[in-house]
Amino acid sequence: MLSILLAALWVAPGNGPAAAAEAVPADLSEADRADLARIEAYLNDLTTMESRFLQFSEEGVAEGRIMLDRPGHLRIEYAPPVPVLMIASSRLLMYHDTQLKQTTFLPVSETPAALLIDDDIMFSGDVTVTAFERTPKAFRITLEQTDAPDTGSVTLMFEDAPMRLAKWRVIDAQGTAVDVSLLEPRFGVEFKNAGDLFSTIDPNSVIE
């Protein structure tokens, strides 16, 4: 379960076989590069977002709510019966099983949460664009970790005119696919209790 849910974000390094080579970059035209720069600018201009989501995987369908407060914060709440809460705050990603009362921490840099919450989002450096597709009203960008392409890939799908992130697909090192679709996203929302919403303090350590 943990690997499937983390795959909704990315594949953490070390989950698959050691990579033998770097990711192979896509052959991009000047128009492609211009569109990628526009998408980077869109992501960097995002401040806050709240959305319902649907997740499809070999384990079935899950749903929940995602909250983004850039830079630095992301919260993913799964609806019952999935007893999971994930919060990314600056350098840590917290995975909390609300049923088992177990908490796991990972560096944000080892998850794709960094793609959404970094101060400066770039489709280069640690990640490589390995495929780029354009249709009249949408874009699909496939990314792999530059130094570890065998750990999997993520494909981000954007609607255009107006630009918005619509869904993503993650394929892990074993070829397992996880699809996440955003439903009725709202942008520029105000989180009045942001300090609590995006806290990565282990819930097990809170004294009631």
Language model segments and positions:
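C-terminal segment of classical bacterial N-terminal signal peptides
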Residues: 2, 9-17
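Boundary at the C-terminal end of the N-terminal hydrophobic targeting segment
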Residues: 7, 18-23
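Extreme N-terminal tail/first-helix region
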Residues: 23-43
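A short, Trp-centered hydrophobic/proline-enriched beta-strand micro-motif
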Residues: 41-58
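Extracytoplasmic
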Residues: 46-48, 61-63, 69-71, 81, ...
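An acidic-aromatic
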Residues: 65-115, 178-179
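Surface-exposed, polar helix/loop patches in the mature regions of secreted/periplasmic/lumenal proteins
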Residues: 98-145
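Gly/Pro-enriched, hydrophobic low-complexity segments
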Residues: 124-128, 134-208
